[in-house]
């Protein structure tokens, strides 16, 4: 009896060992676990990334999912503060890349590699519908120049391009690293930092006079808010007879330096998405329209 029990136990242990080895791929199972690409974002920047229920969707999401398919890797989205995205990608430990409507800047290029640009945006100003901020019109385009915001309280999302521009125009003097005086320096203009442009917009007309944010998020907020807002492009006044000009920027995806496989794959995907179709529109432009709810 003891011998039979011993044989049963031995057989059971052999089966367990065989299962463990086959689970480790040592018995010809050559199907590897799907590798993952970790993407940092801040999902409050529609139409590029935003929540649809509990799921993150948007233009950047579609782009990166195509990259995942190309490399046969799973895309894992990490939603966090916008201000930590570049540094997190730089370290390369918790994230492989960042996709959050990121503007290419020289300072950021010192920390990360950028993909080819895939969208050109300009800064916009969101105002209450009854705002007294003056506008200008040139060639049929109604816009606001920085000087019109003098003495106002302006809100921006921390560490965004809007934040960078606003901080510089209010605080820059010729004696610091900027090398020039900000347009709003000395005008008693106040700058309030907030977690998102959406949160800032909720205070418009109360403690905030204007919100500065990128064009499409501005239009998305105005179109989807229960409150009555309006928005205009933000321009710099022309000097010495030159025309006024918009505050422009280009979006790209940030990648940890040295990760050429991922960077190349992103650029290859973007190259296909930036080809204009028979209708004269790129796939990126069509994605933008879809997520703005503007499809025909």
Model-assigned labels for residue ranges:
Residues 20-23:
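C-terminal motif of bacterial Sec signal peptides marking the signal peptidase cleavage site
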Residues 83-87, 101-111, 165-169, 173, ...:
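A ligand-binding cleft/hinge motif common to bilobed small-molecule-binding domains
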Residues 42-43, 119-127, 215, 223-270, ...:
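Periplasmic-binding protein-like
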Residues 76-89, 141, 177-202:
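Short helix-initiation/N-cap motifs at beta->coil->alpha
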Residues 34-59:
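Short glycine-rich His-centered loop
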Residues 74, 140-144, 156-190, 264-296:
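Ligand-binding clefts/hinges and TM-proximal coupling segments of bilobed small-molecule sensing domains
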Residues 65, 69, 74-148, 234-246:
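Acidic, polar ligand-binding/catalytic clefts
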